[in-house]
């Protein structure tokens, strides 16, 4: 087995941060759409937004353009940790099983994607909680990233920072287990078929395909994860909302219908599509650097 290659870790982190900056307002609208309409939480019961574009316009008009980047600091921190570990672990695991990239198979890539998704998302979970809490706040954000971090820790303890970690890991297993293998296999077949070379156009088409696949597979888990993370839990364990992830899933389906699990799908896809395009195009260009 060859020595650990540091490049996928660094390039993965840099490309993830670049993609996050370019698509963050869409991610914010997705969060706002997913937390609204909860019948068991008076604060989020009102349907304020009719869709992604309406949410973008209303947030910008009522809260200011700066509000569209509410939570960008923990999001950047998340990508610096999650994105770095995710891509580096995925590439390292693939080389552990298969030496040559051309010999990669879909089952092996899926296994590597699932493992890297679970590992990276578990480590980076506190930054995800911070991002969602800050995105959910209307008007002025209370205290910035450090202030919100301390507020969660003081009121909810360490447990609050790892709120929803099981769902985050499940979602990451689905997203990474779908997106990265779909990208690799699509790119491989496009090149081997002779239709396209290893160019930016191939990277664009492959990343668009994997973004759509990832959004379809992950949206129900993403809705439940977002609601669980946004729910406050006191140190004594009391909770006024959902008792657990299954309860959240069942209540959402029962009270709001099956398609409530696909709330925020369009902004989710419209984010994952551009996010993956920016990420993979940036990552592929970084790989070409002679370092």
Swiss-Prot record:
Solcar repeats lie at residues 7-96, 104-189, 198-289. It is a multi-pass membrane protein. The keyword Acetylation applies. It catalyses: sulfite(in) + sulfate(out) = sulfite(out) + sulfate(in); thiosulfate(in) + sulfate(out) = thiosulfate(out) + sulfate(in); sulfate(out) + phosphate(in) = sulfate(in) + phosphate(out); oxalate(in) + sulfate(out) = oxalate(out) + sulfate(in). Its main location: mitochondrion. The chain crosses the membrane at residues 9-26, 71-89, 105-124, 164-183, 204-224, 264-283. Gene3D superfamilies: Mitochondrial carrier domain. Coiled coil: none annotated. One of its GO terms (biological process) is inorganic anion transport. One of its GO terms (molecular function) is solute:inorganic anion antiporter activity. It is found in: Mitochondrion inner membrane. Keywords: Acetylation, Membrane, Mitochondrion, Mitochondrion inner membrane, Repeat, Transmembrane, Transmembrane helix, Transport. The modification N-acetylserine is found at residue 2. GO terms for cellular component: mitochondrial inner membrane; mitochondrion. PROSITE patterns: SOLCAR (PS50920). It holds the Pfam family Mito_carr. InterPro entries: Mit_carrier (IPR002067), Mito_Metabolite_Transporter (IPR050391), Mitochondrial_sb/sol_carrier (IPR018108), Mt_carrier_dom_sf (IPR023395). Increased activity at pH 6.0. sulfate/sulfate exchange activity is inhibited strongly by pyridoxal 5'-phosphate, bathophenanthroline and the organic mercurials mersalyl, p-chloromercuribenzoate and HgCl2. Interacts with VDAC1. Belongs to the mitochondrial carrier (TC 2.A.29) family. Antiporter that transports inorganic anions (sulfate, sulfite, thiosulfate and phosphate) and, to a lesser extent, a variety of dicarboxylates (e.g. malonate, malate and citramalate) and, even more so, aspartate. The sulfate/sulfate exchange is much higher than the phosphate/phosphate and malate/malate exchanges. The transport affinities is higher for sulfate and thiosulfate than for any other substrate. May catalyze the export of sulfite and thiosulfate (the hydrogen sulfide degradation products) from the mitochondria, thereby modulating the level of the hydrogen sulfide. This is Kidney mitochondrial carrier protein 1. It comes from Homo sapiens. The gene is SLC25A30.
